[in-house]
Amino acid sequence: MHCPFCSENDTKVIDSRLVADGHQVRRRRQCLACNERFTTFETAELVMPRVIKSNGNREPFDEEKMIGGLQRALEKRPVSADAIELAISTIKSKLRATGEREVPSKLIGNLVMEQLKVLDKVAYIRFASVYRSFEDVREFGEEIAKLQD
């Protein structure tokens, strides 16, 4: 690894620790030329499955699109950034765990709703109302009744 201070090629690892629930390695390094210390983080590059849209089109998984939907549902709700990050990580892990190269967009929507139900019931109803295209108040009531069971 190149030293960010002097660009020397030779560095040594002086400490390694697992972070982010074991999904990342934090390494403390020291340059052998200038003796400066710096930290690096390593994560496995995992390929997300492609998404099969309801119209049959296929497209790459768009994490930003998923995050946008979660954030809109959680807007002005008392949910921490850490809890949101964990939900995103959980959804991505479940998608990869399917072992499929392609997944239907409906699966992603259902995983998002599953996480929102845990994070915040109001956000869950917000997301479900758009995702399931609620037409009237009765459908809202039915979904709220399911939450209370």
Swiss-Prot record:
Family matches, as InterPro entries: ATP-cone_dom (IPR005144), NrdR-like_N (IPR055173), RNR_NrdR-like (IPR003796)
Co-factor note (free text): Binds 1 zinc ion.
Cofactor(s) for this UniProt protein: Zn(2+)
Domain named ATP-cone: residues: 49-139
GO molecular function: ATP binding; double-stranded DNA binding; zinc ion binding
Zinc finger (unnamed): 3-34
One Pfam short name: ATP-cone
GO biological process, one term: negative regulation of DNA-templated transcription
Keywords: ATP-binding, DNA-binding, Metal-binding, Nucleotide-binding, Repressor, Transcription, Transcription regulation, Zinc, Zinc-finger
NCBIfam families reported in the protein's UniProt record: transcriptional regulator NrdR (TIGR00244)
Similarity comment: Belongs to the NrdR family.
Protein role: Negatively regulates transcription of bacterial ribonucleotide reductase nrd genes and operons by binding to NrdR-boxes.
PANTHER family: TRANSCRIPTIONAL REPRESSOR NRDR (PTHR30455:SF2)
Protein name in the entry: Transcriptional repressor NrdR
